[in-house]
Design a protein with these regions (language model features):
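Substrate-gating cap/lid alpha-helix
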Residues: 149-179
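Hydrophobic h-region of N-terminal signal peptides that target proteins for export
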Residues: 9-17
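Internal alpha/beta domain cores that form substrate/cofactor-binding pockets in large enzymes
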Residues: 31, 59-97, 102-104, 108-147
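Serine-esterase "nucleophile elbow" of acetyl-processing enzymes
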Residues: 18-67, 92-98, 102, 191
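Structural recognition of the beta-strand scaffold that forms the well-ordered cores
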Residues: 29-33, 61-66, 100-106, 138-143, ...
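Beta-propeller domains with acidic blade repeats across secreted/periplasmic ectodomains
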Residues: 61, 130, 255-634, 639-643
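Sec-dependent signal peptide recognition
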Residues: 1-8
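Conserved catalytic region of serine esterases and O-acyltransferases that act on ester linkages
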Residues: 25, 42, 183-267
Length: 645
C-alpha cells in the first residue's frame, strides 16, 4: 500500500515541452479520475497533501472521482447501478463538484489487454477526455504507474504509456511523468497528510456511501431508509456530510489539527442476562451448551469465528453495522481469545486488530488474517502489518458485501456477495467483475480472482460456503435456501439459474461436520445458522441424480429467546461446535430502520456446544514436524486436516 503513493508521487514532474504548467488558481476544484492506482493514492493522502502544500495560497479543493476497476472503456463512477440516477453522468458530476481541473490516469490495467487493443484504447480515452474537458476544464494526464504485482504481465505497459504521451501531445495537454516529486513541492508534513486523509474519508463516505442501494436504489423506499422515532431519514443524515467536508477543508488550509472525532452512539438491550439466554436453549439429545465468551471479553456484535494453528480463536465484531454515522470513524475489531486451561471458556482476550469497518469476511492463514470489509480485502500479519490485497468490491448494501471467507480443500479462499453489490476488482490478470449476487474464488498467492454465478444466477445473498469430504460445495442464502455448486464450475455467466435444493429460510454461516467427538450419524452433515428461527439447523446432502437434495434433521440448538441470532457456526480444535450469537432483536436489513433504537450494539456471545462426555485435546500443529503434519492430513478431524495444510 505504501509503494503505490510513492510511485505515483514520483511520476508527477512537469514535462518541459508541455503546453501548460500544472498551476492551480484561486477557486480551482481539482477532480481526480482513474482506477485503483488513483484510488489508493487518494486514500493515502500524500498526493493531495503535496499539491495542497505547493498551492496553499490558492486554497484549491480536491474531489476524488476515481473508482476501482475504472478503465477508459467503463467507469463505475457514472456506470454503476443508480449512480446516473443519483448523480448524473460525467457532465453533471463534474458540474456538481464545481470541477475546473481534471487529473486523469488510465492505461495501466488496460495494458493487460496487450498491443492488439491499443487503437481501441486511444479512441476510448479520446472520447472520455472530450467529456472531461467539456466546459473549458483544464485537463492533465498522468502517465500510467508501474504494476505493484510481480505476477502481472507488464510487457505492453510501455506501449500504452507511449500512447498516453502521444494523446497528450496531439491535444496539447500536460503529461505528468518522470521521477520527481510534485514539481519541487517536497514531502508534505505528516500532520498535513493526516488532515487530508480525514477529509478524504468524509468525502468517500459521502460520494460513495455504503448502502447507497438503500439511499438511491430500489430499496430506498423500504423501512431502512425512512425517518422514524424523531430520527432523520437515511438521506437526511447523508446530507450532513458536505458541511463536515467543508469544515475539514478549512482546517487543512488554516493549518489546524483534525477535529476530535465524535463518539458513536451505542445502544443495548436492557435485559441481556446470559443466564436467561442459556436457560432458553433446547439442545439436541446427548449434547450440552455452555458460554465460551461474551461482552465481558469485548465481544459485541460478533460476525464470525476462526482459529489459528495454535487453537486461538479470532472473532470479528462490528458495532458499526449497518451504517457509519456521519463524522464518526469506524472502529470495528477482531479479538483473539484463548482458553488456557481447557475448561471450555475463554480466559484471555486481546484486541488483534481495530479500526475496521464492518468486517463481514475473515479467515486465518499464511501467518495472518484475511479480512473482507466493504470494498477491500486486507491481510493483517502477526507482526501488526496491514496491507490492502485487492479493492473494488461493491458496497451498495452493507449486509451483502463480501463475506463468510472459507478455505476450500484446494487452498483457495471462497466468499460470497449479495445482489445489491457490483464488484470490479483490478488483479494481476485484469479486472475481475461480479454483477449482483454470486461467489468468488481467490488464489492468494497469484491474486487470481474468479467469479461464479455472475448476474444473480444462484442465491440472492450468499452468506456461507462449505465443502464436504469430496470437495462438493454448498452455498447458503441469507434470503433463503441452500444451493449446490459443482467442483466443475467455471467463471462464466449463466442464463439458467441454479436450482434451490433447500427450503427457504434465513441462513447465515455453515459448517460440514467431521469430528471424532460427534456421533457417526452426524459425520458429513451440515449445520447452518438459522437466525430468523433462533436456532442452529441441521441437514444432510443426499445424492439426487447428478446433484443433491437436502434432508433436514432435528436442529442442534433451539432457543425461545428472541435475541439469539446465530450468524456463524464452526467446529473448533477441541471437536466442539462454536456458535456465533449476534444477539439482537433486529433481524432484517432493509425492513428495519437503520438507526432503530433497539439495535443492540453492546452485546454478543460465543456458545460452545459439545457432546456430553466427549473430549478431544487440541492438536499442537505449530510445532509439529513435517512427518506429523502429513499424518495429520489423515486425521478424522476436519479442523485438524484443514489446519495441517
Amino acid at each position: 500500500l505504501k509503494l503505490l503513493p510513492i510511485l505515483l508521487l514520483a511520476t508527477l514532474a512537469i514535462a518541459a515541452s508541455a503546453a501548460e504548467k500544472l498551476e492551480l488558481r484561486p477557486g480551482d476544484v481539482v477532480a481526480f479520475v482513474g482506477g485503483t492506482d488513483m484510488v489508493r493514492a487518494q486514500k493515502s493522502g500524500r498526493l493531495e497533501a503535496a499539491l495542497t502544500q505547493r498551492h496553499r495560497e490558492a486554497r484549491p479543493k480536491f474531489r476524488d472521482l476515481a473508482w476501482d476497476g475504472d478503465t477508459v472503456y467503463f467507469q463505475g463512477t457514472v456506470g454503476e447501478r443508480w449512480r446516473r440516477e443519483a448523480f448524473g453522468g460525467w457532465r453533471e458530476q463534474l458540474q456538481r463538484v464545481g470541477a475546473t481541473v481534471v487529473i486523469a490516469q488510465f492505461g495501466r490495467i488496460e495494458s493487460l489487454d496487450g498491443p492488439a487493443r491499443l487503437d481501441a484504447f486511444r479512441e476510448a480515452y479520446g472520447k472520455l477526455l472530450d467529456e472531461l474537458a467539456a466546459g473549458g476544464r483544464r485537463v492533465f494526464l498522468l502517465a500510467p504507474g508501474p504494476f505493484e504485482w510481480p505476477q502481472a504481465d507488464a510487457s505492453a505497459l510501455a506501449d500504452y504509456t507511449r500512447a498516453v504521451k502521444t494523446l497528450a501531445e496531439a491535444r496539447g495537454l500536460t503529461l505528468l511523468e518522470g521521477d520527481a516529486v510534485v514539481a519541487g513541492g517536497g514531502e508534505p508534513p505528516p500532520a498535513l497528510v493526516a488532515a487530508v486523509r480525514e477529509k478524504h474519508r468524509l468525502w468517500s463516505d459521502y460520494w460513495r456511501p455504503a448502502n447507497w442501494k438503500c439511499l438511491f436504489g430500489d430499496d430506498s423506499k423500504r423501512v431502512f431508509s425512512n425517518a422514524t422515532a424523531g430520527l432523520p431519514s437515511f438521506k437526511q443524515e447523508w446530507e450532513t456530510f458536505p458541511p463536515l467536508i467543508a469544515a475539514a477543508e478549512a482546517r487543512i488550509f488554516n493549518g489546524e489539527a483534525p477535529a476530535p472525532l465524535p463518539l458513536p452512539a451505542r445502544s443495548g438491550s436492557a435485559d441481556a442476562d446470559t443466564a436467561k439466554e442459556l436457560a432458553a436453549f433446547k439442545v439436541l439429545d446427548g449434547f450440552e451448551v455452555s458460554l465460551f465468551a461474551d461482552e465481558r471479553q469485548g465481544i459485541a456484535n460478533p460476525l464470525s469465528v476462526r482459529w489459528d494453528a495454535d487453537g486461538r480463536m479470532f472473532v470479528a465484531c462490528s458495532d458499526t453495522y449497518p451504517q457509519i454515522e456521519p463524522g464518526v470513524k469506524p472502529n470495528d475489531r477482531i479479538y483473539k481469545l484463548t482458553d488456557r486451561d481447557g475448561d471450555g471458556r475463554a480466559d484471555a482476550s486481546e484486541v488483534f486488530a481495530e479500526g475496521l469497518n464492518i468486517p463481514t469476511g475473515m479467515e486465518v492463514g499464511h501467518d495472518g488474517v484475511y479480512v473482507g470489509q466493504g470494498t477491500e480485502i486486507l491481510f493483517l500479519d502477526w507482526k501488526g502489518g496491514r496491507k490492502i490485497l485487492l479493492s473494488g468490491f461493491g458496497n451498495g448494501d452493507s449486509h451483502q458485501t463480501i463475506n463468510s471467507f472459507v478455505w476450500s480443500p484446494g487452498g483457495e479462499l471462497w466468499f460470497g456477495q449479495g445482489d445489491g453489490i457490483e464488484s470490479r476488482v483490478e488483479t494481476p490478470s485484469g479486472v475481475s467483475s461480479l454483477f449482483q449476487a454470486g461467489v468468488f474464488r481467490l488464489r492468494p498467492g497469484q491474486l487470481q480472482l474468479d467469479a461464479f454465478l455472475d448476474d444473480f444466477m444462484g442465491p440472492g445473498n450468499p452468506w456461507g460456503v462449505a465443502f464436504d469430504d469430496f470437495g462438493q460445495s454448498f452455498v447458503i442464502d441469507g434470503a433463503g435456501g441452500v444451493f449446490h455448486l459443482t467442483p466443475a464450475s467455471v467463471p462464466v455467466r449463466r442464463r439458467l439459474r441454479l436450482p434451490q435444493i433447500g427450503k427457504p429460510g434465513g441462513y447465515c454461516g455453515i459448517e460440514c461436520l467431521g469430528a471424532g467427538t460427534l456421533p457417526a450419524a452426524m459425520q458429513g452433515e451440515f449445520l447452518v445458522g438459522d437466525y430468523k428461527k433462533n436456532q442452529v439447523s441441521r441437514f444432510a446432502a443426499v445424492d439426487d441424480g447428478a446433484g443433491f437434495k437436502v434432508e433436514w434433521r432435528e436442529p442442534l440448538l433451539r432457543s425461545s429467546h428472541r435475541n439469539f441470532r446465530p450468524v456463524d457456526v464452526k467446529l473448533g480444535p477441541d471437536g466442539a461446535i462454536y456458535v456465533v450469537d449476534w444477539y439482537n432483536p433486529i433481524t432484517c436489513h432493509q425492513d428495519d430502520f437503520y438507526r432503530h433504537p433497539t439495535r443492540d450494539k453492546t452485546h454478543g456471545r460465543i456458545w460452545r456446544v459439545a457432546r456430553k462426555g466427549a473430549t478431544h485435546p487440541a492438536p499442537a500443529l505449530r510445532t509439529a514436524t513435517d512427518a506429523a503434519l502429513f499424518e495429520a492430513l489423515r486425521s478424522p478431524e476436519r479442523w485438524t486436516r484443514q489446519k495441517a495444510k
